[in-house]
């Protein structure tokens, strides 16, 4: 956690809630996928959130991962170098995030650089990597390595084509929101406040 002191009060409660969202089982799946997917040897961290964060913190593993999802020669991150300088590490994380967005990840699904670098929200980092893996499986371009069942299946577009005849017939059907013209009705019922007529 960089140069920040401990959180107290409400900030501490919020931080604890965020930390509870972190999934250790998902961490192992992501590590397995990243080590399988990357073309170069990126190592393997010990189990635990801090070890996972330190493994990804300099951005080199993330850049290798996004480059491995593109064909040879079309890698989005051209220069990957390990560095101990904070701004270089954060720059590489930013390059990964920009490349992930170009790959097709929604802006709302992408973590902030500080979430990873300061370890503020590692669950958000996991969600971004899960979305990236799911999108790589859905693309089905032969560049995904690993078990497709590791990631949730993305839905695919399934357009419907109706003929003009079918569209015209649909206009004749009374929608369920309108009620029905069959079954019990209020015919013969008296209004409120009127006496009941028994003959």
From Swiss-Prot:
Keyword Ubl conjugation: yes
CDD domains assigned: CH_TAGLN2
UniProt cross-references to Pfam families, sorted A to Z: Calponin, CH
Family indicated by similarity: Belongs to the calponin family.
Protein name: Transgelin-2
Modified residues (Phosphothreonine): 180
Glycyl lysine isopeptide (Lys-Gly) (interchain with G-Cter in SUMO2) crosslink site(s): 171
Secretion signal span: none
Sequence positions bearing Omega-N-methylarginine: 182, 196
One Gene Ontology cellular component annotation held by this UniProt entry: cytosol
InterPro entries membership: Calponin-like (IPR050606), Calponin_repeat (IPR000557), CH_dom (IPR001715), CH_dom_sf (IPR036872), SM22_calponin (IPR003096)
Domain Calponin-homology (CH) per the UniProt entry, residue ranges: 24-136
UniProt Calponin-like repeat ranges: 174-199
């Amino acid at each position: 956690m960089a140069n920040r002191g401990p959180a107290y009060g409400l900030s501490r409660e919020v931080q604890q809630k965020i930390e509870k969202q972190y999934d250790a089982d998902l961490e192992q799946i992501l590590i397995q996928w990243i080590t399988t997917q990357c073309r170069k040897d990126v190592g393997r961290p010990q189990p635990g959130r801090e070890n996972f964060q330190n493994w990804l913190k300099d951005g080199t593993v993330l850049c290798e991962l996004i480059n491995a999802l593109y064909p040879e020669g079309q890698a989005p991150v051209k220069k990957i170098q390990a560095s101990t300088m904070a701004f270089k590490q954060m720059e590489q994380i930013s390059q990964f995030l920009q490349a992930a967005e170009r790959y097709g990840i929604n802006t709302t699904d992408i973590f902030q650089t500080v979430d990873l670098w300061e370890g503020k929200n590692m669950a958000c980092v996991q969600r971004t990597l899960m979305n990236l893996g799911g999108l790589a499986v859905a693309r089905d371009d032969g560049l995904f390595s690993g078990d497709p069942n590791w990631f949730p299946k993305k839905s695919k577009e399934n357009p419907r084509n109706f003929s003009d005849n079918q569209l015209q017939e649909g206009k004749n059907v009374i929608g369920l929101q309108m009620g029905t013209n069959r079954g019990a009705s209020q015919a013969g019922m008296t209004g409120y406040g009127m006496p009941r007529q028994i003959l």
